[in-house]
């Protein structure tokens, strides 16, 4: 069979029609909650990938020549189809990735919002008229698509990380080739199928899945027809891709690792801070690049915050994301679970204490845990945890806090809670991060620029800046006037 029995529950079977029956022609996809084999996703050979890039190059010329309004119309139809298939797409994502169904359906809506946004931005790629330095010249700029763009996307947000890149690329007039994670390819093929149903040509948007991620990355970074690479993943891999892309000066966008501080000042609304901490930390079982990774709480409110935070954490239900009432699904793999557990064990050995009793769970499930008496020098504070663990550190002054919060190579997201307007501005400007949530634990939206500083990456996704990542600015100088 090309699909496991569970996959028969997807009502719109066109979303999984790409799956192959022969294991020799595909990559096995399993449910991390149950270990069940879901089926096989089609794998691309090296020649397949090279052919995809060639076809994308040819198709891009025709796609860019279409009126922006025409491209926008297809993107809007894609957006509508994503909404209409929210139930099936959410279920498919939960099956292959593990997150609770409500979160998965929420990701479908979030991912779709980028398609809607960039459908409108497609019609607003304005140039400029520049006042000339002399009377006989006229100066203008125009924006043009850069050509073939490619992307490598992660498993933790298997739909949104594709639409956040494909939306602006297609809106700009680029063609787009994406390699999703081998752990979660089904969602990628499904959203591409809906794009085709919306009228987007199959050569303009392509999904390729290689057995060897490094090989695909090497093809993307070395192929002369690819002019842009967008990557979401670890800083370590991003660094390699940037080095490889430098050979022919490809443009790159990198959304890399994070180590987000979540800060609670002594003048904070503690209940609001706890609610924000829950939203920021435990979404997708803590497997997000922008989730709170380390908590800094002022000594005056440390005990109060710890007590309320842990009480809320103990109410979380761990289990299969398809089951009613589940808040926390499995982590993605056994190696991920072992790495998270090693950080917990190391912190406890160094003096940290779990606020509530630790529970070891079977399979890929992990009980959420709050650790108190954590110190800034512990490994769990400097590493990106990527799991349902919240280490909480004390601080006594704003200056001490800023020094600790900025003591990292990363600079993606940060969060803090305070009701003092003077402190709010001071801290917001002092934090060395691309994004700052102020009295808010959920900050990502299609209308605002998403991205980091330092070794958390370069470039921005979403907002009006997102489409510029896929366009060249050309300056035209008219003489003889």
Provide a role label for each language-model segment.
Residues 1-38:
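Hydrophobic face of amphipathic alpha-helices that form TPR/SEL1-like repeat modules
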Residues 37-44, 59-65, 151, 262-265, ...:
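Short, well-ordered beta-strand elements within core beta-sheets of diverse protein domains
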Residues 39-125, 136:
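Glycine-rich loop-to-alpha-helix module at the N-terminal edge of alpha/beta enzyme cores
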Residues 127-272, 395:
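Rossmann-like NAD(P) dinucleotide-binding subdomain of oxidoreductase/dehydrogenase enzymes
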Residues 236-375, 438:
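ALDH superfamily catalytic-core signature
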């Amino acid at each position: 069979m090309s699909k496991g029995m569970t996959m028969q529950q997807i009502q719109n079977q066109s979303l999984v029609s790409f799956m192959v029956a022969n294991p020799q022609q595909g990559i096995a996809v399993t449910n991390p909650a149950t270990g069940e084999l879901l089926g096989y996703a089609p794998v691309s050979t090296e020649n397949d990938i090279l052919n995809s890039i060639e076809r994308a190059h040819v198709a891009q010329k025709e796609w860019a020549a279409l009126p922006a309004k025409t491209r926008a119309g297809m993107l809007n139809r894609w957006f509508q189809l994503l909404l209409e298939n929210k139930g099936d797409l959410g279920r498919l994502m939960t099956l292959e990735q593990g997150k609770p169904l409500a979160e998965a359906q929420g990701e479908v809506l979030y991912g779709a919002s980028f398609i809607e946004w960039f459908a409108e931005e497609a019609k607003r790629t304005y140039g400029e008229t520049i006042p000339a330095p002399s009377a006989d010249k006229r100066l203008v700029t125009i924006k043009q698509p850069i050509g073939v763009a490619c992307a490598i996307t992660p498993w933790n947000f298997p739909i949104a990380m594709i639409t956040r890149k494909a939306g602006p690329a297609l809106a700009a007039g680029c063609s787009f080739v994406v390699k999703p994670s081998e752990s979660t390819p089904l969602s990628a093929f499904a959203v591409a199928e809906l794009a085709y149903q919306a009228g987007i040509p199959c050569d303009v948007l392509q999904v390729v899945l290689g057995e060897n991620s490094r090989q695909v990355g090497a093809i993307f970074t070395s192929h002369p027809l690819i002019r842009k690479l967008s990557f979401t993943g670890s800083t370590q891999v991003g660094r390699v891709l940037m080095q490889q892309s430098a050979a022919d000066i490809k443009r790159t966008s990198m959304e890399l690792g994070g180590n987000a501080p979540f800060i609670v000042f002594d003048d904070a609304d503690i209940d609001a801070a706890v609610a924000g901490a829950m939203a920021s930390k435990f979404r997708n079982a803590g497997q997000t690049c922008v989730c709170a990774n380390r908590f800094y709480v002022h000594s005056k409110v440390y005990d109060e915050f710890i007590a309320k935070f842990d009480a809320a954490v103990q109410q979380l239900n761990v289990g299969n994301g398809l089951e009613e009432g589940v808040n926390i699904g499995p982590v993605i793999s056994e190696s991920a679970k072992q790495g998270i557990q090693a950080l917990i064990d190391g912190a406890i050995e160094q003096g940290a204490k779990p606020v509530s009793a630790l529970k070891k769970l079977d399979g890929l499930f992990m009980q959420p845990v709050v650790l108190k008496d954590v110190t800034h020098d512990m490994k769990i504070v400097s590493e990106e945890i990527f799991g349902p663990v919240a280490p909480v550190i004390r601080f006594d002054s704003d200056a001490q806090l800023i020094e600790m919060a900025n003591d990292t190579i990363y600079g993606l997201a940060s969060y803090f809670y305070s009701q003092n307007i003077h402190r709010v501005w001071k801290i917001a400007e002092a934090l060395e991060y691309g994004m700052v949530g102020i009295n808010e634990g959920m900050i990502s939206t299609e209308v605002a620029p998403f991205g980091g500083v330092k070794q958390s990456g370069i470039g921005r996704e979403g907002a009006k800046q997102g489409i510029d990542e896929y366009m060249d600015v050309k300056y035209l100088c008219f003489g003889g006037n």
